[in-house]
């Protein structure tokens, strides 16, 4: 599979309902994207300017939708998830997850189809994240992972902390509530 990174945009179909940079409760509130130039890279590959950097050198994200009343968020990722070299999970928890939990978000749906590879080391931070979410009746689930990424995550035991759900086909055609319901149904089955 050949990846043309700068052509991969975060999903924008729900922007009429939610824009993370306009959400005063979001860690990305007020962030300005360069609309005229590609200024972010993962390794030597430029990526679309709409992705948000949370401090990782190899992994970017976009918070597609957050509903504080129902306490959930949907986050899409692109790049290499590298806990081994960069401790991406610690940065993610400290800069994104903890502030969102403080705002009442306890259900995390992570879209992983653009995670190209995973390098893990330990499950401590994943266990912490699951504990924080489940204390409020929530969960953390990764959906639409590529098979090799799912296997890489299972190899270090992440599937014992977080849900590594299967494919949620054509989720982009539906409202965000559909994805939430699908993840809840999967968790209950």
Feature names for model-found ranges:
Residues 2-37, 51:
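Extreme N-terminal leader/targeting regions
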Residues 6-16, 148-189:
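A cross-taxonomic marker for long C-terminal extensions/tails that follow the last structured domain
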Residues 46-92:
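STAS-typified acidic loop motif
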Residues 93-98, 127-131, 159-163:
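Short, low-complexity, polar/charged sequence segments that are solvent-exposed and flexible
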Residues 105-108, 112-157:
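Amphipathic alpha-helical interaction surfaces in cytosolic regulatory modules
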């Amino acid at each position: 599979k050949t990846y043309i990174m700068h052509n991969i945009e975060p999903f924008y179909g729900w922007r009429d309902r939610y824009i993370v940079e306009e959400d005063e409760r979001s860690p990305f509130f007020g962030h300005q994207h360069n609309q005229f130039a590609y200024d972010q890279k993962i390794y030597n590959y430029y990526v679309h300017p709409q992705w948000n950097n949370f401090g990782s050198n190899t992994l970017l994200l976009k918070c597609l939708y957050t509903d504080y009343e129902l306490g959930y968020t949907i986050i899409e990722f692109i790049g290499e998830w590298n806990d081994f070299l960069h401790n991406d999970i610690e940065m993610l928890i400290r800069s994104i997850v903890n502030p969102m939990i403080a705002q009442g978000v306890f259900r995390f749906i992570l879209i992983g189809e653009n995670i190209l590879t995973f390098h893990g080391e330990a499950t401590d931070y994943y266990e912490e994240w699951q504990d924080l979410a489940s204390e409020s009746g929530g969960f953390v689930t990764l959906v639409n992972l590529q098979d090799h990424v799912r296997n890489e995550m299972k190899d270090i035991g992440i599937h014992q902390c977080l849900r590594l759900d299967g494919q949620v086909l054509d989720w982009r055609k539906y409202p965000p509530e559909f994805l939430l319901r699908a993840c809840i149904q999967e968790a209950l089955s």
